[in-house]
């Protein structure tokens, strides 16, 4: 890209730092390789010598003679409408946005975050609608088939799945006990059966030493 911003009489510059930071000035005369005589009649900057390192050249150029007086500079400035043109540039908008961001509080940052989330959600919804419309327009048969498959899958997901035993057979459905009508007494629980103990076997008495076995 060819460089087109040169130091010349009538060039409008942005003051980046110093006592007049953030203001626009016009170069009236070049003093030497380090300084220039500038004037800002519409930005409250008096005519003075200013170093080049605190100026950033813009694309705007005013037409007035060399070392012109302030009234000629003012007339050329107002005729070119420099203030309105500068406010419409991306450069000025970025500076303004940076200043606003520096002044934001925590609550302001929270509101910005919520607004961004809502914006992104709306954008996603619109993109999905456009994609669906484009799909229907490009291949309506495929879109219908895809919709039918999705409906079948949704219907299959709603059908309850029956339990299958380890042997591969279906488990028998357990019937719930029927509730008795009001007024009927509930059957008593079955009594526990007594378990009969086997008769105890007596040990044989020891024989006398003289007796034969």
From Swiss-Prot:
Alphabetical keyword list: Acetylation, Cytoplasm, Isopeptide bond, Phosphoprotein, Repeat, Ribonucleoprotein, Ribosomal protein, Ubl conjugation
Database matches in SUPFAM superfamilies: Translation proteins SH3-like domain
The keyword Repeat is assigned to this record: yes
Glycyl lysine isopeptide (Lys-Gly) (interchain with G-Cter in SUMO2) crosslink, residue number(s): 124
Location relative to the cell: Cytoplasm
Record PTM N6-succinyllysine, positions in chain: 85, 202
Region called Disordered, residue ranges: 166-213
UniProt-listed GO biological process terms: ribosomal large subunit biogenesis; translation
Domain of life (superkingdom): Eukaryota
Sequence repeats: 169-173, 174-178, 179-183, 184-188, 191-193, 194-196
The UniProt record lists the keyword Lipid metabolism: no
GO molecular function: RNA binding; structural constituent of ribosome
Intrachain S-S bonds: none
Region annotation 2 X 3 AA tandem repeats of K-G-Q: where it falls in the sequence: 191-196
Gene3D superfamilies per the UniProt record, alphabetical: 2.30.30.30, 6.10.250.2270
Major place of residence: cytoplasm
Gene Ontology CC terms, in alphabetical order: cytoplasmic side of rough endoplasmic reticulum membrane; cytosolic large ribosomal subunit; large ribosomal subunit
Modified residues (N6-acetyllysine): 79, 85
Region (4 X 5 AA tandem repeats of Q-K-A-[APS]-X), start-end ranges: 169-188
Residues with the Phosphoserine modification: 139
Entry similarity comment: Belongs to the eukaryotic ribosomal protein eL14 family.
Role: Component of the large ribosomal subunit. The ribosome is a large ribonucleoprotein complex responsible for the synthesis of proteins in the cell.
Complex and partners: Component of the large ribosomal subunit.
Entry protein name: Large ribosomal subunit protein eL14
The gene coding this protein: RPL14
């Amino acid at each position: 890209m060819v460089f087109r911003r040169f130091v010349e009489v009538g060039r409008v510059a942005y003051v980046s730092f110093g006592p007049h930071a953030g203001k626009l000035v016009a170069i009236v005369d070049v003093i030497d390789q380090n300084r220039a005589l500038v004037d800002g009649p519409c930005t409250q900057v008096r005519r003075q010598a200013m170093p080049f390192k605190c100026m950033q050249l813009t694309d705007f150029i005013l037409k007035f003679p060399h070392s012109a007086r302030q009234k000629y500079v003012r007339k050329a400035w107002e005729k070119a409408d420099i203030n309105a043109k500068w406010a419409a540039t991306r450069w000025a908008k970025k500076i303004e946005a940076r200043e606003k961001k520096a002044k934001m509080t925590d609550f302001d940052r929270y509101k910005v975050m919520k607004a961004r989330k809502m914006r992104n959600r709306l954008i996603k919804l619109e993109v999905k609608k456009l994609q669906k419309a484009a799909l229907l327009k490009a291949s309506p048969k495929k879109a219908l088939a895809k919709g039918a498959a999705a409906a079948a899958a949704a219907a299959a997901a709603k059908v309850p799945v029956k339990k299958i035993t380890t042997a591969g057979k279906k488990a028998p459905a357990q019937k719930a006990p029927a509730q008795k009508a009001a007024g009927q007494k509930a059957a008593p629980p079955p009594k526990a059966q007594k378990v009969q103990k086997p008769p105890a076997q007596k040990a044989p008495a020891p024989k006398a030493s003289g007796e034969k076995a």
